């Protein structure tokens, strides 16, 4: 029998391999990835500085260690050029050499790529993105060379705010730019976003909102950058970091005939429309929902591992709050499903506030907890929210 093949060595790929091995220690398992296959937890990148973690301390294991630990054949630095669903084969390329890899079941754990803005100027190619440990290593190396520690971050979403807090906490001057009028504008009601912003500003982070970057130019013999904004303002930075969001990596799947929308479309069994092809992680749009967070990956991996072991199992999405790593403004969010209309009910405390999202049936559908006092209600509130994808027997 041909092996089960996982494309991707991120958290989704490795978590699935680990869960599968708990259930089936023998079936041949192959992982294919374009990078070096080092296993690490990507969420740790946005607070590694304040945790005194150097890039070399972040990995959990290299390809050799993971291959031994999980009884897994790893084809690193290998590109999947095409999927042939009819023959159950992949066309691979490494160092200019093409090979064919057969599969019995194929799992797409290909993640998401950073969104890149079209920005003018001779400094635009120097803008950092951090979507991998390799990216992060380059960012930290550049950061260590800089004298004035002025960092401009493009994007006031989750990752932008987490990096801003981490950098500010370690002595950097941080300015965050976003087209939205408030940070975390897609996740938070306006009044909570305002309070969140105020807390971060009190810690020393600067926000320039309702505008965007038009140009990044090298100045001072290439040592610094002039960041020109659409509102006419110019900022001087030692480093520019882009954190404006991620786009699920759907091209490989799409070319193979897999149905895609924002992500790779799957049902609650994580099956795509093509036989024996599955998707998990940041690339997977499960029952019409994209959830690029850690807990959904864990739920997906456990369910799919069982299915691949012969026990058909639907993924179960309970209410899964997201803890935002911004100690200057402790925040937990349970996002409201996109198709649900809600009214927000707010309770204020000395150190923050709590907001509940109530739908037209008087059911709690989400919440936001800002500050330590509100944060204590996380477990109680989570139990009141209906499952996003109910458990199936």
Swiss-Prot record:
It is found in: Cytoplasm. Induction: Constitutively expressed. Its EC number is 1.18.1.1. This is Rubredoxin-NAD(+) reductase. Pfam families: Pyr_redox_2, Rbx_binding. SUPFAM superfamilies: FAD/NAD(P)-binding domain. Involved in the hydrocarbon hydroxylating system, which transfers electrons from NADH to rubredoxin reductase and then through rubredoxin to alkane 1 monooxygenase. InterPro entries: FAD-bd_OxRdtase, FAD/NAD-bd_sf, FAD/NAD-binding_dom, Rbx-bd. Keywords: Cytoplasm, FAD, Flavoprotein, NAD, Oxidoreductase. Its cofactor is FAD. Belongs to the FAD-dependent oxidoreductase family. Pathway: Hydrocarbon metabolism; alkane degradation. One of its GO terms (cellular component) is cytoplasm. Homodimer. It comes from the Bacteria. FAD binds at residues 9-12, 33-34, 42, 80, 162, 282, 294, 325. It catalyses: 2 reduced [rubredoxin] + NAD(+) + H(+) = 2 oxidized [rubredoxin] + NADH. GO terms for biological process: alkane catabolic process. GO terms for molecular function: rubredoxin-NAD+ reductase activity.
């Amino acid at each position: 029998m041909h092996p089960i093949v996982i494309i991707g060595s991120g958290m989704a790929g490795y978590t699935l391999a680990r869960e599968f091995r708990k259930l089936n220690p023998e079936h041949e398992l192959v992982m294919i990835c374009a990078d070096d296959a080092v296993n690490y937890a990507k969420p740790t990148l946005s607070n590694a500085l304040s945790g005194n973690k150097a890039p070399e301390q972040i990995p959990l294991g290299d390809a050799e260690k993971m291959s031994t630990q999980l009884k897994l054949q790893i084809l690193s630095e290998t590109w999947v050029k095409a999927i042939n669903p009819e023959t159950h084969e992949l066309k691979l390329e490494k160092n200019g050499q093409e090979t064919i890899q057969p599969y019995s079941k194929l799992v797409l754990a290909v993640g998401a790529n950073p969104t890149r803005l079209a920005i003018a100027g001779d400094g635009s190619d120097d803008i950092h993105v951090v979507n991998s440990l390799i990216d992060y290593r380059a960012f930290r190396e550049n950061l260590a060379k800089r004298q004035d520690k002025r960092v401009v971050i493009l994007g006031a979403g989750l990752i932008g705010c987490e990096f801003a807090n981490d950098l500010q906490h370690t002595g950097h001057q941080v300015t965050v730019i976003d087209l939205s009028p408030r940070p975390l504008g897609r996740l938070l009601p306006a009044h909570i976003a305002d309070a969140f912003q105020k807390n971060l500003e009190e810690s020393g982070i600067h926000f320039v909102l309702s505008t965007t970057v038009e140009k990044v130019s090298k100045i001072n013999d290439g040592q610094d950058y002039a960041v020109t904004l659409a509102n006419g303002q110019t900022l001087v930075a030692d480093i520019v970091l882009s954190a404006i969001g991620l786009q699920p990596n759907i091209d490989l799947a799409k070319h193979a005939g897999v149905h895609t929308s924002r992500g790779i479309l799957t049902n609650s069994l994580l099956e795509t429309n093509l036989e024996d092809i599955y998707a998990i992680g940041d690339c997977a749009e499960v029952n019409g929902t994209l959830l690029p967070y850690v807990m959904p990956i864990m739920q997906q991996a456990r369910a799919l591992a069982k299915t691949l072991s012969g026990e058909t199992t639907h993924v179960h999405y309970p209410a899964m709050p997201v803890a935002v790593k911004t100690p200057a403004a402790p925040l937990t969010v349970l996002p409201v499903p996109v198709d649900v209309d809600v009214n927000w009910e707010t309770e204020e405390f000395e150190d923050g506030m709590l907001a509940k999202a109530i739908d037209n049936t008087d059911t709690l559908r989400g919440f936001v907890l800002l500050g330590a006092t509100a944060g204590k209600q996380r477990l109680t509130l989570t139990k009141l929210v209906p499952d996003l994808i109910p458990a199936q027997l």
